[in-house]
From Swiss-Prot:
Heterodimer of PSME1 and PSME2, which forms a hexameric ring. PSME1 can form homoheptamers. Belongs to the PA28 family. The gene is PSME1. The keyword Transferase does not apply. This is Proteasome activator complex subunit 1. Induction: By IFNG/IFN-gamma. Residues 68-98 have a biased composition (Basic and acidic residues). GO terms for biological process: antigen processing and presentation of exogenous antigen; regulation of G1/S transition of mitotic cell cycle; regulation of proteasomal protein catabolic process. GO terms for molecular function: endopeptidase activator activity. It comes from Homo sapiens. The keyword Translocase does not apply.
Length: 249
């Protein structure tokens, strides 16, 4: 039978890594996960995440509504200039200029919440990755028979993969909010007389506020579900065949 020859010192390094990983995982389950569940549950109960009147989230839009008379005069001057100057490049440059209102700030209330949320997203993904690696290292050599414990490992691994996909999507969700809000602010600045664009900015802020609360809930639930399912099946996950077998990896 073909065998891969591994130097004893190399195997020793892998064994040290594996033992260290197992210790970290057991510490996570024994203390860190329960602590995070409690912390995130407390976060969800804070006034900052329980705003009943979402209109209080409204951030000021420093975009003045133009005077119709002055705008008409400005439009006439623009038409006159276009007649005199047919340079397409110059027209393109004029269109790319920023709005006359100056810079428009982010919604500070949303930004403050996101500054608290993003480290939590990073943390839960890293811990999930560590626990997933620990689980993979418990998978025994592929053999016929007595595979019920392996089936349990596979089910838990599927759950972890699903959680990882959901949590990774939070980064994209946050970036999408800023992109969409920036587009809405740009439209409101270019067409300040259109109230719908101004309202769109506020609607996006309210939607993101609701999403932030849901993301905190999902992170808390991820810790709780991982803690629960691993604790309930710890023996099967660690020793799927009732005894320690060689690693599949």
């Amino acid at each position: 039978m073909a065998m891969l020859r591994v130097q004893p010192e190399a195997q020793a390094k892998v064994d040290v890594f594996r033992e260290d990983l197992c210790t970290k995982t057991e510490n996570l389950l024994g203390s860190y996960f329960p602590k995070k569940i409690s912390e995130l549950d407390a976060f969800l109960k804070e006034p900052a995440l329980n705003e009943a009147n979402l209109s209080n989230l409204k951030a000021p839009l420093d975009i003045p509504v133009p005077d119709p008379v002055k705008e008409k005069e400005k439009e006439e001057r623009k038409k006159q200039q276009e007649k005199e100057d047919k340079d397409e490049k110059k027209k393109g440059e004029d269109e790319d200029k920023g709005p006359p209102c100056g810079p428009v700030n982010c919604n500070e209330k949303i930004v403050v919440l996101l500054q608290r949320l993003k480290p939590e997203i990073k943390d839960v993904i890293e811990q999930l990755n560590l626990v997933t690696t620990w689980l993979q290292l418990q998978i025994p050599r592929i053999e016929d028979g007595n595979n019920f414990g392996v089936a349990v490992q596979e089910k838990v691994f599927e759950l972890m993969t699903s959680l990882h996909t959901k949590l990774e999507g939070f980064h994209t969700q946050i970036s999408k909010y800023f992109s969409e809000r920036g587009d809405a602010v740009t439209k409101a600045a270019k067409q300040p007389h259109v109230g719908d664009y101004r309202q769109l900015v506020h609607e996006l802020d309210e939607a993101e506020y609701r999403d932030i609360r849901l993301m905190v809930m999902e992170i808390r639930n991820a810790y709780a579900v991982l803690y629960d399912i691993i604790l309930k099946n710890f023996e099967k996950l660690k020793k799927p065949r009732g005894e320690t077998k060689g690693m599949i990896y």
